[in-house]
Each structure stands twice: as structure tokens, then as C-alpha cells.
């Protein structure tokens, strides 16, 4: 009875108020636009534009979703180190919403490689020649308690691209570095050599271990005898440093290199000598002179020239650095004598001893008259100067093309000269 009454009520309800899902009609009335004549102001909204807007809104409301978008997951880029390391043959693609695995297998369509890529990897060529980890065949260590005592370095085979096999000596880790005494075969006994065999580490590397046992323990009596013999032997030096006679000290001027004993040079090249405080002593300097001839065994003995006693040169205030003069080579046109500047007296320089080192200069003849000459230095050492007289070259008398003779001490352009051969 209840079901019949429910059906009657539903039928009556559908007739009275049908179940239609339509947008409700707007109860708002349109605003009437009141137009006034003779008004310059435009209306705010035109009727045509209102119709167009209404049609546009209807299209936007009835939007049909053709496909379903994949859900985007947020990615935390902050603090991440992005390293793009694509191997050859991997297409760089982005699939939204799909997480890439750590070592995901590639489908065959994504692989672009040679047909013999497996053979290349086995032979370690082309792509697999450099920068690839080789396959370790074993991790066995036959000598776990040994430490290397010699370096193992690659040795190139001359003339070939291969390498020679290397040897590395290992020793027990607990062995102490004892004093090495002379060991013979009779004292040491028999040496045991044991070959551990050949072990293949990688396809191109093998290790062969050879165990060598050398017994070095001896009887205490023999060891004591060797130590006693070593202690009783007198200590002898290999090189004997003896003087046939007492060494003779030769003292020269500070900062000047001693010249040769067989030829007295006119100018000795100065060198820098470390400053030492010397005690005034009587010095003897032997000088041998020869007229540019090599000394022979049958030559007559040269008498020694003994210099009288004199006090050694008092070290200057600034040390031997003031004796260093540069070794100059001048132009042949500079033939004037050396012009000596005034020596500094008292306080040498405001800026230190470096400014007091002045070289002895030679000026051009045209500049000699303009420079006042100072008094020459008082030197106790006599200087020998070798004057080289050069013969002036013969110059033909020069004249112009018209026949006028020109003075010889004036240089003219070659285009105006006329010389007779």
C-alpha cells in the first residue's frame, strides 16, 4: 500500500513540477536607457554590445573537456644540484607525472648504437676505451699482511705502445728495521722461493705473487764476533786532507778578483766579496811576470818580489759594495781620459750607500771642456796602462764634381763627393 501511494505521489509531482536542470531565469530587470535629444555625451553601454557579451558568456559556461591532463607534482628545485649526464643513445624527453627510476631499462626503440656495441665493450675500444670502469674478475688479496717497500711505476716498452711487467717488493708489516749486517749464503741458509701462481684481476691485468723467505737469524756467537771485529778495526778516512807545507794566505784588495800569476792584467774584473773584519797583519804577495810566454820547466827562477810591511786597508764605512763598478765597453769615438767626479765626504747620501756607487765614466771629447776636473784619487797602487796606438786610415782627398777640394775632417753626403780611385 505504501509503495502504491509513493508511486502516485511521484507521478503527481512530475506533472506539477517536472525535474528539469536548467539555469534559473534571472529575475533582474534590464535597466532602461533613457535617451535625451541634443546631448553630446555617448551612452555608456550600447545594446548591441550587451547582446554580444551575453552570447560570449554562454559559450564560456558550456566548456567541454576533450582530454584529461596528468596531475602535476611539485618539484623542489631549491638546494638541488642538477647534472645532465645523458649517455649516448638516451633521448632526452620529459614525461609529466612520471618518475624516472634510478636504473630504468631502455626500450629498444630508444637505443641508437652500433650493432657490435657488446663486442666493443668487451674489447675496450671506441666508446669504452677511456673513462670506463673495467670489470673486476676477483678481489682476492694473497698478501693481506704485506706492505709495499718499493714504488710500482709503469715502464714503457721502447719502440712499442705496450708496457713492461713491473715488480713490487712487499715486506711484513710488523718487521722492524734492524741493522743490516753482512750476510752470506752459508750464514743465512737456504732461501725458499714459493710461487703463489698467476691471478687474473681484470681482462688486461694479472698479478703473479712470489713468496721469498730468507732466514736471517744467526747464532749469537757469530753475531758477537762480527760486532767485535767491527769495533776493533781502526777508523780510516777514505780521503786524506794533508798539506805538504803550511798554507800561505794571500790577501788582495777588497772586492777585486786576483789576476793571473803568469800575466798581470791592466784591469781586473771586480767581484762582490763578503765583508770580513780582518786583523792588521803583515802580508806577503808573490807576483810572477812573464812576457806573454808560457812557463816551462827549464825557465830560470823568478825572484820573489816582497812587498814591505804595511797596514791592511781599513774597511770602508759602507763595506766592499763601493768597489763594485760596472764593466763598460765604450764607443771607439770616446778616447778621452777618465773624468773622476768629486768623492763624497762626511755623510755620503741621504738615501743610503747605494747612491754613493758611481762608475768611472768617459765623456765624449766635445763634453770634456764643459766638465771641471777634480783632483785625482790618491792611490797607493801603481796602475799600468797599455796604450794602444791606432793608425789613422788613409782617406783620399775629396772634392765636388766641379773640382773644388773639400777639407778632410768634415763628412759630406756621398751624393756630392767625387773621389779619385
Swiss-Prot record:
Domain of life (superkingdom): Viruses
Keywords associated with the record: DNA-binding, Host nucleus, Late protein, Viral capsid assembly, Viral release from host cell, Virion
GO biological processes: viral release from host cell
GO cellular component, one term: host cell nucleolus
Compartment(s) of residence: Virion; Host nucleus, Host nucleolus
DNA-binding is among the record's keywords: yes
Induction notes from the record: Expressed in the late phase of the viral replicative cycle.
GO molecular function: DNA binding
Note: All late proteins expressed from the major late promoter are produced by alternative splicing and alternative polyadenylation of the same gene giving rise to non-overlapping ORFs. A leader sequence is present in the N-terminus of all these mRNAs and is recognized by the viral shutoff protein to provide expression although conventional translation via ribosome scanning from the cap has been shut off in the host cell. This protein is only encoded by mastadenoviruses, and may therefore play a role in mammals tropism.
Assembly information from the UniProt record: Monomer. Homodimer. Exists in equilibrium between monomers and dimers in solution. Interacts with the histone-like nucleoprotein; this interactions bridge the virus core to the capsid. Interacts with core protein X; this interactions bridge the virus core to the capsid. Interacts with the endosome lysis protein VI; this interactions bridge the virus core to the capsid. Interacts with the peripentonal hexons. Interacts with host NPM1; this interaction might play a role in virus assembly.
Role this protein plays: Associates loosely with the viral DNA to form an outer shell around the nucleoprotein-DNA complex and links it with the capsid by binding the endosome lysis protein. Dissociates from the viral genome during entry. Might be involved in nuclear capsid assembly of the viral particles through its association with NPM1/nucleophosmin.
Similarity annotation: Belongs to the adenoviridae core-capsid bridging protein family.
Protein name per UniProt: Core-capsid bridging protein
Organism the protein comes from: Canine adenovirus serotype 1 (strain CLL)
Amino acid at each position: 500500500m505504501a509503495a502504491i501511494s509513493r508511486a502516485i505521489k511521484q507521478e503527481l509531482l512530475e506533472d506539477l513540477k517536472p525535474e528539469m536542470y536548467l539555469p534559473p531565469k534571472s529575475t533582474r530587470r534590464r535597466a532602461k536607457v533613457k535617451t535625451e535629444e541634443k546631448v553630446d555625451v555617448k551612452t555608456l553601454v550600447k545594446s548591441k554590445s550587451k547582446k554580444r557579451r551575453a552570447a560570449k558568456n554562454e559559450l564560456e559556461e558550456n566548456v567541454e573537456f576533450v582530454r584529461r591532463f596528468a596531475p602535476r607534482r611539485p618539484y623542489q628545485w631549491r638546494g638541488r644540484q642538477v647534472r645532465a649526464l645523458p649517455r649516448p643513445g638516451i633521448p632526452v624527453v620529459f614525461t609529466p607525472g612520471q618518475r624516472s627510476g634510478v636504473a630504468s631499462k631502455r626500450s629498444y626503440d630508444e637505443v641508437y648504437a652500433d650493432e657490435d656495441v657488446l663486442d666493443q665493450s668487451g674489447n675496450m675500444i671506441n666508446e669504452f676505451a677511456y673513462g670506463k670502469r673495467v670489470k673486476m674478475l676477483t678481489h682476492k688479496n694473497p698478501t693481506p699482511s704485506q706492505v709495499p717497500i718499493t714504488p710500482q711505476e709503469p715502464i714503457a716498452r721502447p719502440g712499442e705502445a705496450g708496457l713492461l711487467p713491473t715488480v713490487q717488493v712487499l715486506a711484513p708489516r710488523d718487521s722492524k728495521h734492524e741493522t743490516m749486517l753482512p750476510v752470506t749464503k752459508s750464514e743465512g741458509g737456504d732461501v725458499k722461493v714459493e710461487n703463489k701462481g698467476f691471478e687474473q684481476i681484470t681482462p688486461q691485468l694479472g698479478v703473479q705473487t712470489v713468496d721469498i723467505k730468507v732466514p736471517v737469524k744467526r747464532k749469537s756467537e757469530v753475531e758477537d764476533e762480527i760486532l767485535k771485529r767491527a769495533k776493533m778495526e781502526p777508523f780510516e778516512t777514505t780521503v786524506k786532507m794533508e798539506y805538504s807545507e803550511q798554507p800561505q794566505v794571500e790577501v788582495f784588495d777588497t772586492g777585486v778578483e786576483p789576476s793571473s800569476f803568469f800575466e798581470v792584467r791592466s784591469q781586473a774584473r771586480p767581484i762582490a766579496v763578503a765583508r770580513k773584519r780582518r786583523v792588521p797583519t803583515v802580508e806577503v804577495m808573490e807576483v810572477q811576470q812573464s812576457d806573454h810566454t808560457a812557463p816551462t820547466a827549464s825557465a830560470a827562477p823568478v825572484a820573489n818580489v816582497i812587498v814591505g810591511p804595511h797596514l791592511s786597508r781599513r774597511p770602508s764605512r759602507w763595506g766592499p759594495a763601493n768597489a763594485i763598478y760596472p764593466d763598460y765597453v765604450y764607443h771607439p769615438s770616446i778616447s778621452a781620459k777618465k773624468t773622476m767626479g768629486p768623492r763624497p765626504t762626511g755623510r755620503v747620501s741621504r738615501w743610503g750607500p747605494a747612491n754613493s756607487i758611481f762608475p768611472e765614466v768617459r765623456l765624449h771629447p766635445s763634453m770634456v771642456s764643459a766638465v771641471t776636473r777634480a783632483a785625482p784619487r790618491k792611490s797607493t797602487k801603481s796602475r799600468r796602462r797599455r796604450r794602444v796606438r791606432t793608425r789613422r786610415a788613409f782617406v783620399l782627398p775629396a772634392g765636388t764634381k766641379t773640382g773644388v777640394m773639400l777639407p778632410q775632417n768634415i763628412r759630406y753626403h756621398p751624393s756630392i763627393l767625387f773621389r779619385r780611385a
